[in-house]
Amino acid sequence: MEKQDAENYARLKEAWNETKERILVYEDQPAYVPYCRLTNGKTRDAKEVLGTDQYPYLKSVDCAADKNAEDAFQSKEIDGTGYEITKQDSAGYVLEVKQGENVIDGDTFRNQWELPSSCYTMRQTDKKTTVITQGIGHGLGLSQNMAEELAKEGKSYKKILEYFLRVLF
């Protein structure tokens, strides 16, 4: 355990030394850099999620390693029935849920029911709804799990950031 702690400390110190006093920039301004723990297999496009062209470097990218991660799929039973997913983005994340005449934003629904991901499907019974989620988080920006896999392949932090963000720093 002590040897592993020493190795981890050495890796952290090296990463800190390589990145200290560096920031990611876009158009001479600090870049908005969201991240999530785990995607559904691809990240989301900022234009679809945020409805703006302000972050053109946040494009959807494949995260194949996320599909096989330990917590890739989870399920949760919630109260009520009659929920319908009415809108999803191109990566499969929920943008809108309807129950009767009520329409709710997909992320608001996620937060309301404390779901681990914004990518989900539903299965309904007489009195309950089972929500099956894929990934952990909102799916926008960098996937921590995929970044870790790229690092294990020997990719530098710069190559990892370029893969997800396509910004210069």
PLM region spans:
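Conserved, single-site charged/polar hotspot
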Residues: 1-169
